[in-house]
Amino acid sequence: MSTPMIFAIPSKGRLKDQVEAWLADCGFKLEMTGGARGYSAELSGLPGVSVRLLSAGDIAAGLDSGDLHLGVTGEDLLRERGDDMDSRVMLLRALGFGRADLVVTAPKNWLDVDTMADVDEVGHAHLARTGRRLRVATKYVTQTRAFFARHGVADYRIVESSGATEGAPAAGAAELVVDITTTGATLAANGLKILSDGVILKSQAQLTASLTAGWNGEQLDALRRLLSVVEAKGRAGKLATLVWPAEQDRAAQDAVAAFIARGGSRRANGALLATADLFDAAAALAEAGVEPVTVSRPDYVFESRSAVLDRFAEALKSKI
């Protein structure tokens, strides 16, 4: 019996709903195998894949350790696993949802503090005056240390937070906060401001593959089929097909030749073009007297090779 590719998605919350909607848009229906409240599922139309529903943090850990082959989780959680993340996982596709920024914040009433250089100065002064380093409350220890080091800030210490990190300064537990935010509203409500150069990471949900998992041929084939559909759906959203009468094909092809030259492709009595070129191409056809011209949007645009899969396969070979 073959061993399926293990694909993990978030088990609850808005991110779970967004992942399910994304899969459905690609044509894959999530079918629970453990009942409505279960934590395992299958994807209709994609055999050889076992879906696990886990917390976003557990997905990041499972991809890092190799217990999972594939997963969707936040980039912030993946990068928190260590500076050498890229040696253990590969980000295959940014999904465009689950967006949040990991940011450095200071109290609003620190009027002279707007940049990391200002934090460095305040840290020196605070240490000289009190004998203590600035305290930075965060759950994101790895990324905080790396970011502060890149900016040459040394006079601080981490206060690891497990609760509402943004409340640490008001509670007297820290001077600065590094936290994840979508709108900044919660930080502002707690009297904090984001430093002008304090964005550590602009995170979003990532389709991610493990480089430490054991992959066999069948599992790689399942990944290939999944990526083929995902990439075809992504391409389709950027393309449109123009169709014109067969008897006007020569004039039409001449009219759209410039758009074909920069990445479009010819079709029988038509052309597949980038949506960004759609109206300019329609205008060129009208000027050439070609009519009527209809436009349709493809559901999928498949190509024979996946550059992403090729890159992943090469990375796997280098691990052997």
Curated annotation (Swiss-Prot):
One Gene Ontology term, aspect cellular component: cytoplasm
Q: Catalyzes what?
A: 1-(5-phospho-beta-D-ribosyl)-ATP + diphosphate = 5-phospho-alpha-D-ribose 1-diphosphate + ATP
Give its localization: Cytoplasm
Which keywords appear in this protein's UniProt record, sorted alphabetically? Amino-acid biosynthesis, ATP-binding, Cytoplasm, Glycosyltransferase, Histidine biosynthesis, Magnesium, Metal-binding, Nucleotide-binding, Transferase
Q: Which Gene3D superfamilies match?
A: Periplasmic binding protein-like II (3.40.190.10)
**One Pfam family in the UniProt entry:** HisG
Q: Which EC numbers does the record give?
A: 2.4.2.17
Q: Which cofactor does it need?
A: Mg(2+)
Activity regulation (UniProt):
Feedback inhibited by histidine.
Superkingdom in the source lineage: Bacteria
Q: Which GO terms describe its biological process?
A: L-histidine biosynthetic process
Q: Which GO molecular function entries does the Swiss-Prot or TrEMBL record give? A: ATP binding; ATP phosphoribosyltransferase activity; magnesium ion binding
Involved pathway(s): Amino-acid biosynthesis; L-histidine biosynthesis; L-histidine from 5-phospho-alpha-D-ribose 1-diphosphate: step 1/9
Annotated transmembrane regions: none
Family (UniProt): Belongs to the ATP phosphoribosyltransferase family. Long subfamily.
Query: What role does this protein play?
Result: Catalyzes the condensation of ATP and 5-phosphoribose 1-diphosphate to form N'-(5'-phosphoribosyl)-ATP (PR-ATP). Has a crucial role in the pathway because the rate of histidine biosynthesis seems to be controlled primarily by regulation of HisG enzymatic activity.
State what protein this is by name.
Answer: ATP phosphoribosyltransferase
Species of provenance:
Caulobacter vibrioides (strain NA1000 / CB15N)
